[in-house]
Each structure stands twice: as C-alpha cells, then as structure tokens.
C-alpha cells in the first residue's frame, strides 16, 4: 500500500507579511471604534493613526518589486501600528472587559499571536516560524510546501492518502 501526503486546499489569497499586518491593523481599528461607541474608551477616542498607516501601506503596495530595505521598513511600520492598537485595546479591556463581542475577542487572540510571530520573524530576520498564521479569518490554515511545479506552497490541512 502506497501512502501519499496531500493537502486539502483552502481558497485564501496568497498571504504576505505586510498584508496580514495591515489587515490586523484594520480589524483592531474597527474594534477600537466599537469599544468607543459603546462608551468604553471614556470621552476621547484613542489615536489610531489610521490615515498615516493606510498611506504608508499603500505607498509600499504600489511598488512593483520592493527591495529588502523597503520591505523591512514597511513591516516595521505596520508592526508599530499594530502594537499601538493592541496597547489601546489592552487598556480598554482592562477597564471594561465587556467592550468587545466574543467574535472580536477571537480575532484579538489571533491578532496577538500573529503579532508575536511577525515580531519574532522581524527581529530574527527570518521568514519561518512554527504554526505560522496565514489567514486571520481561518487561523487553522497552515502553509504546506509541496514542491510542485505549478504551486510551490499550498494552504490547507495536510491529509494522508
């Protein structure tokens, strides 16, 4: 009997570190808005620098082939924006634990793990980390290197046939 490992492909867009961090930042900004509308942030909404962050990310994405220096700069910027927003949400949740819905708390846990992974890869100057998150909406999906000519990396659950 011959066994072969294959993958159940998931339909997700190809994940880049910068796009995952940008998506995380946008979700965090939405959570901060939700908490502020519920009155959990006090009188003044925390600064999210959303316009600057979006401008920085779009400036990076427009580049057809960014060099290594530009990629690291974009990752550093997005990591900073995500870290700031996570800090705001930590203080909001410390004061008012019911400020976010259960679904938002799940996203927050995934974003925390993603931030730690991305920060570790940035600081160690690597592109590999165990149990890497490649989708915020489907955090169980993992990259599987297949070595096929058409697609080198597939995303999904690994199965043995």
Which role does the model predict for each range below?
Residues 1-160:
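Polybasic low-complexity intrinsically disordered regions
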């Amino acid at each position: 009997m011959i066994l072969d490992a294959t993958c159940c492909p998931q339909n997700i867009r190809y994940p880049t570190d910068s796009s995952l961090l940008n998506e995380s930042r946008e979700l965090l900004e939405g959570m901060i808005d939700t908490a502020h509308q519920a009155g959990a942030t006090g009188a003044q909404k925390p600064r999210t620098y959303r316009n600057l962050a979006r401008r920085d990310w779009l400036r990076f994405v427009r580049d057809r082939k960014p060099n290594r220096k530009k990629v690291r700069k974009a990752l550093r910027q997005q990591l900073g924006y995500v870290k700031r927003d996570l800090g705001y949400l930590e203080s909001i949740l410390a004061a008012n634990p019911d400020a976010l819905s259960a679904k938002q708390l799940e996203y927050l846990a995934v974003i925390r793990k993603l931030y730690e992974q991305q920060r570790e890869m940035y600081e160690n100057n690597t592109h590999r980390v165990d149990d890497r998150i490649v989708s915020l909406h489907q955090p169980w999906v993992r990259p599987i290197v297949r070595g096929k000519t058409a697609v080198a990396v597939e995303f999904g659950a690994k199965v043995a046939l």
